[in-house]
Amino acid sequence: MKAPKFREFISEAPDNGKYKLLVITDEPEQAKTFHTADRLREEAEKLGWKYYLYKLTGGYTTSPEGALRLHNKDDDKGFEVSGADTIAIIRGSVTRKDSWMDIVSLLEKHSVCVVNSRETISVCADKYRTALRLADYGVKQPVTHLINDPENSEQAFEHLN
């Protein structure tokens, strides 16, 4: 399989200049700072973008009149997202629970630009799948043998060339 060139499948849309940045995380309540999230907020503010830090614990979603809104605990107004103007950044903590990954699927269903997609997160979380995917695109990979039983690890090692 050969990777297509970017210009073959992507083009830049007109820039309306105003986007919304949604950062999805689940940090402990006692965490006083969210270093990466704070930096993202600073950059969004510099660009004049609206920003929302959505915490999965205690958070919920609504869809009034078809529009998707994310709400943190005690936030009745929430934050409306759409595929037209929202960029969602998925923090690593979200990947700790499969049920939390459903928010990524929901955003993708609403055509929101998600960094990283559920598929990307899934592939990257699995070292072997990552190696297979990279090999599909011609990226050289070390010889790999799957070891399903630790007792046979020496035998598998002996077969590496």
Residue ranges: model-predicted function:
Residues L21-D26, S82-G83, H110-S111, R118-N161:
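Active-site nucleotide/adenylate-binding loops and adjacent lid/helix of ATP-dependent enzymes
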Residues K2-V115, T120:
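ATP-binding N-terminal substructure of ATP-dependent carboxylate-amine bond-forming enzymes
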